Amino acid sequence: MSSFSYRTLTVALFALICCPGSDEKVFEVHVRPKKLAVEPKGSLKVNCSTTCNQPEVGGLETSLDKILLDEQAQWKHYLVSNISHDTVLQCHFTCSGKQESMNSNVSVYQPPRQVILTLQPTLVAVGKSFTIECRVPTVEPLDSLTLFLFRGNETLHYETFGKAAPAPQEATVTFNSTADRDDGHRNFSCLAVLDLMSRGGNIFHKHSAPKMLEIYEPVSDSQMVIIVTVVSVLLSLFVTSVLLCFIFGQHLRQQRMGTYGVRAAWRRLPQAFRP
């Protein structure tokens, strides 16, 4: 066999393997948006399109409410509404008997609308521990949430959360710290960040109202002994002064009553007995 014939056979065999049929058309299906985050009961517009010039059939598969807004041969535009849970939308087209599809992932979220910070106790001695608690009610998805605890501009602690049930949850973070002298002049705060960028959404921030501690210096044992001694002495002096005032008052009363008694008896004596 000549080299020309061998090359021709090789090319023909390659064409049969790689290109099995000239009538089988390759086409693509696209969906916009590919992913999106919406609030509960929200809606979104979805566009399904294909590169097939004359698709036989096409559409959007979903269990949610949908309305076909507009369409042409190569695309269809839908409104999907009443989205209450995470779901997958599927665009599909059939071209020359072959079906292709592409999915759009939809996530439901609730941003942090309330961030509650609590300091316990609020009156703390220097060197003693206290607890910082931050609570965010009704937020989802939890695995996209991060809570930051601040002392002034300093980040004391931050915490992320694992994937939870697909429903609004309450997120809580607790951190124990030790009070120092400057804490009485610093604001404590909490920041909630819900990052939905990976889900086709935005980033939501919500700060708590700032809180402050009341700081005092603890009293040493020697100072306590002095204070107790001084208080005891002052209390003794007070009691003694009260008793002396009472005794002195009784003495004056008796003296006055004794003088008045002699004069009254003198007046009652008959004239004959008076000198």
UniProtKB/Swiss-Prot annotation:
Protein origin, superkingdom: Eukaryota
Bilayer topology: Single-pass type I membrane protein
Sugar-bearing residue positions: N47, N82, N105, N153, N176, N187
Coiled coil: none
Keyword RNA-binding listed: no
Annotated GO biological process: cell adhesion; cell-cell adhesion
Residue numbers spanned by region Required for interaction with EZR, MSN and RDX and co-localization to microvilli: 251-275
Signal peptide as annotated in the record: 1-24
Entry function: ICAM proteins are ligands for the leukocyte adhesion protein LFA-1 (integrin alpha-L/beta-2). ICAM2 may play a role in lymphocyte recirculation by blocking LFA-1-dependent cell adhesion. It mediates adhesive interactions important for antigen-specific immune response, NK-cell mediated clearance, lymphocyte recirculation, and other cellular interactions important for immune response and surveillance.
Protein name (Swiss-Prot/TrEMBL): Intercellular adhesion molecule 2
Organism: Pan troglodytes (Chimpanzee)
